[in-house]
């Protein structure tokens, strides 16, 4: 008589199953994550599956665990990553993401042939631009706008690789593409280029902060710009760090509604990750940790 036997889970799945049976924990896969994040899902390519152990710390919810960009990996667990210390975030900041490599943010976009084609045709982001950008340190910031047509403004600061001429040529090509799309170019300040609709509403632009540091912005011209010193304040002990104010984001309808209620009601959330370099994971495996504050 034949009988079906389920093959024991291995690797990350096995560890996550064991954690769920023994501790307070959460376990997710790529489908569940995409359902929760909606249109933001392409930016979570590093976190396609994983699990977190939950605990409390002086009124905070903290977690540690692991995530992987590839489903079904059989690698050993990555090194433990301690939860971040409290780092208050105040208005008008809504979100701050710092990373050591821009491809940590963009690899999900580049994996989609439709998005890749759109970015190449409309904004000139072809294979050579992707190749040069992927190793660049970056800071992404979302700030609430109290007035005007936008609920928030977005800034992306990147320390570009050498060859200023290459980037100047790309910005010139991008300018021609934006003009063909009906936008009007302005230069209100030195090294600052803004773009507006025919009705005069500024919708974005860029500014050189230093020889290799460029800030792109969507929305109005930022009231304050990041420093132009030799290095951005990027965390060196992790590969990326995210801070956000979920409650404030929800109030301006910028937080995905399917996120868990405890996240939506939180005053602040911190999440960070460190890639496991070398070994069998091929750079897809991460240690992750975080902190949530309800007050």
Name each model feature, range by range.
Residues 63, 69-180:
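Extracytoplasmic/luminal low-complexity segments enriched in Pro/Gly and acidic/polar residues
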Residues 8, 39-42, 78, 83-84, ...:
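Proline-rich intrinsically disordered, low-complexity coils
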Residues 34-45, 114-130, 187-202, 257-265:
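Generic detector of solvent-exposed, compositionally biased contiguous segments
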Residues 16, 20, 32, 41, ...:
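Generic secondary-structure transition motif, activating predominantly at the C-termini of alpha-helices
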Residues 1-17, 139-241:
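Single conserved position on a long alpha-helix in the C-terminal lobe of the eukaryotic protein kinase
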Residues 26, 31-34, 61, 78, ...:
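Short, low-complexity intrinsically disordered segments
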Residues 6-109, 243-295:
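Leucine-rich, highly hydrophobic segment in Treponema pallidum outer-membrane-associated proteins
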């Amino acid at each position: 008589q034949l009988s079906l036997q389920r093959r024991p889970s291995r690797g990350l799945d096995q560890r996550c199953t064991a954690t769920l049976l023994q501790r307070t924990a959460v376990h997710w896969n790529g489908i569940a994550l995409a359902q929760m994040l909606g249109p933001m899902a392409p930016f979570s390519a590093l976190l396609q599956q994983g699990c977190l152990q939950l605990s409390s710390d002086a009124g905070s919810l903290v977690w540690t665990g692991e995530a992987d960009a590839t489903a079904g990996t059989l690698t050993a667990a990555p090194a433990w990553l301690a939860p971040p210390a409290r780092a208050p975030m105040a208005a008008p900041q809504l979100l701050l993401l710092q990373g050591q490599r821009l491809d940590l943010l963009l690899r999900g976009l580049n994996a989609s042939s439709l998005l890749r084609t759109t970015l190449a045709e409309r904004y000139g982001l072809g294979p050579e631009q992707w190749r040069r950008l992927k190793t660049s340190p970056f800071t992404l910031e979302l700030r609430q706008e109290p007035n005007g047509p936008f609920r928030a403004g977005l800034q992306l600061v990147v320390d570009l690789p050498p060859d200023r001429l290459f980037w100047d040529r790309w910005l010139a090509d991008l300018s021609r593409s934006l003009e063909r799309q009906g936008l009007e170019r302005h230069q209100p300040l030195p090294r600052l280029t803004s773009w507006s609709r025919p009705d005069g509403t500024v919708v974005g632009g860029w500014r050189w902060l230093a020889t290799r540091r460029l800030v792109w912005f969507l929305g109005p011209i930022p009231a304050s710009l990041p420093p132009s010193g030799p290095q951005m304040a990027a965390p060196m002990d992790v590969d990326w760090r995210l801070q956000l104010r979920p409650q404030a984001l929800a109030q301006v309808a910028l937080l995905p509604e399917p996120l868990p209620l405890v996240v939506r009601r939180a005053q602040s959330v911190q999440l960070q990750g460190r890639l496991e370099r070398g070994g069998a994971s091929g750079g897809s495996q991460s240690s992750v940790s975080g902190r949530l504050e309800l007050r």
